[in-house]
């Protein structure tokens, strides 16, 4: 599915002929993704993986020689979801992997800044996520049980990242992210040392392709 390509959507002139604010993002694939009206036809996994591997979690305030990327975070969340629900089906796992995919366009807005600006960003985020879901054969709106699993796994990942990488004390992390999750030594070994951008991009794409193959 990720190999299928359609021609990039043309950039249409605005009515009135004058200059206007640009609301689309040009991708390395050649796509132009309109943030106001995103089309599933303009979503490509190569752009998602490339972008997420270069977007920093925690505003870059993490330990290590490399940023802790949204791509690596997404793989951690998916691993925690699999550990919590071992029988989670392929579509469920794919939805978990893609839960932060809109950030390849809009970046990772930290929670304190979200509190400052309010909920205005959410409409853009929701439109982008719906287009991404449709592109890869998922429902635009996920079932509530799956949404809850994603939220729980995301909070568990945030706790681990906060205490291992972002300098939080255990008590402070519990206050913001809840009780620490149960996880294996393999999860800490495999997902909590920041990777290079190239490695994060490759591993994200490999996991995506594996899920597509079933």
Language-model segments: what does each one mean?
Residues 9-18:
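Short, low-complexity intrinsically disordered segments enriched in A/P/G/S/L with frequent Arg
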Residues 2-5, 19-214:
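Metal-dependent phosphohydrolase cores
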């Amino acid at each position: 599915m990720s190999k299928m390509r359609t021609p990039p959507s043309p950039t249409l002139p605005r009515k009135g002929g004058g200059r206007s604010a640009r609301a689309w993002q040009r991708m390395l694939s050649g796509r132009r993704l309109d943030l106001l009206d995103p089309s599933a036809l303009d979503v490509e996994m190569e752009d998602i993986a490339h972008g997420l591997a270069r977007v920093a979690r925690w505003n870059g305030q993490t330990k290590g020689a490399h940023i802790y990327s949204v791509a690596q975070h997404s793989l951690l969340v998916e691993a925690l979801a699999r550990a919590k629900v071992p029988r989670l089906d392929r579509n469920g796992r794919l939805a978990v992997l893609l839960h932060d995919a809109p950030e390849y366009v809009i970046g990772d807005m930290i929670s304190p800044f979200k509190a400052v600006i309010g909920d205005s960003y959410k409409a853009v985020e929701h439109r982008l996520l719906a287009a991404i879901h449709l592109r890869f054969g998922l429902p635009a709106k996920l079932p509530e049980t799956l949404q809850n699993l994603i939220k729980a796994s995301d909070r568990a990942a945030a706790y681990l990242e906060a205490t291992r990488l972002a300098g939080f004390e255990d008590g402070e992390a519990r206050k913001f992210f809840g009780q620490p999750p149960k996880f294996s030594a393999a999860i800490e070994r495999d997902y909590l040392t920041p990777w290079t951008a190239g490695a994060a991009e490759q591993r994200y794409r490999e996991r995506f392709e594996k899920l597509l193959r079933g």
